[in-house]
């Protein structure tokens, strides 16, 4: 008796803005089947599609040689979509890998490419050590790298696009003994592969099962390795049914293509909030343990230690960092606010020490924050970043506003912040951007403008707090730069401290910056900023998972039941997920009301609930040594930051 394995795949074609479904074109399809006998190189069989009559199936894929596998294909129309179901049946035990390609009508050189959360345009902002056109113009990758298991190709000249998305029950994965070359899986996986190829100058969608990565596999930051092809056992008499979906549409530009595709993917996967027993109040109570146990109070700068911390002991380190990973001042404000609201004298006392020591010892001669100090080595960063400085001011404004609303004032802090904002005005370039890095004498170290939106936030906050229109005008100039160089070009890059690649935080920061400006604007100006926020938000959303990747038994994240929907990929170069969200959920709820778009608020709820899953408390420490220490680097795919790999955290924890 045949066993139909529940790994379903079909192809569906739909047109955006056009009536009726597209016709499946067999002449545009290519396929191959690779079979491997253990201990021997795999043999690849090119396949030819033959039309059938008087059969349940419409087509059969055939090889020139006799092979121990039958491959049938059925085409059906559902609503405005065309579905193609491929069924493989083994005549004897085989280890197989199936691949199909569909040619578009697009010249490869005219196209931009999109694999959500991993590949944007041609990834040319990344170096050749990461996946990009620098290495090849054809790439296929395993599906769990992607926030949606989809590949999209956008023809800029024809203003058309085509996507392929996997439709399957992603319920399992299997371990392999190695990560490159031909690998036989230890069990059954749900993971296939997807990507794009240049077929004689024509762009083609490529996809298959089980997973494959070519021409290289990406194993850790800036480290490419030889390609990998996985082979899964299909026993004699067993069948496997596979399903993909092809979607076609039109878009004025790459941004419209991405926004249409995100909406299509959202409607396809329909992610639901993740059910946990953790209320917001309980979550905050658990997280407050970090504020107590991580406090370091015997240094010139007091701080909560969360940078470069080991997950197996969570011992405090010597690193005090104002923004970026450390967020010392924002942690202090969160502890301060929570302490007042919950009558926690211990939290208030520690937070006050952080603010007091930074006020006295935390500034450079020119008035910048000492943004990174390592007390173990004595190292102090002398090259400043607009991001860390901005995030420090952002935190202090939250503190000052809270204090003012509760009848307390801090004129010394106000003077410090005002001085920093005045120096910001000197740093700003004529076109509105801010340099990414600079020295205390304002000499420029890195002129890249990708981090500019991080400065918009404190400038708007400074305008609201001090009623100083100079700061608002400066913030508006940043928006002019963002619109011209990032948002209009759909090119969100280098928001981090050193990498230049496309990353989630660049679009998230751009959306937050224009959101802040919309809140302090009226009329046409407000409408304009709101539109920019929406555009940037779609790109930020594209990084967040709409589906749950499978894990193999023994991989900790899978064993504790992690659902990846709602978590965000980090960047083109760093293929892990994290909890970076900050105000983005509030922005999505705001946009939902502004545009009567329920998807935004619904997904904000998915994000908010999903972020609670790895809350570490006694009996549910999730691989972390201490209660309340929530990890950042969560390795969900076949990539690692140098240790552990899929299903685990990096051995270091960033709070």
PLM features per residue range, with description:
Residues 24-26, 40, 56-65, 70-236:
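Beta-strand/loop-rich accessory regions of lumenal/periplasmic or secreted enzymes
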Residues 2-10:
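Sec-dependent signal peptide recognition
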Residues 376-380, 398-469, 477, 484, ...:
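Active-site lining segments of carbohydrate-active enzymes
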Residues 273-280, 338-352, 399-418, 460-476, ...:
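Structural helix-adjacent loops and short alpha-helical linkers that scaffold large soluble proteins
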Residues 30, 37-40, 46, 51-53, ...:
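Low-complexity, Ser/Thr/Pro/Gly-enriched N-terminal "stalk/linker" regions
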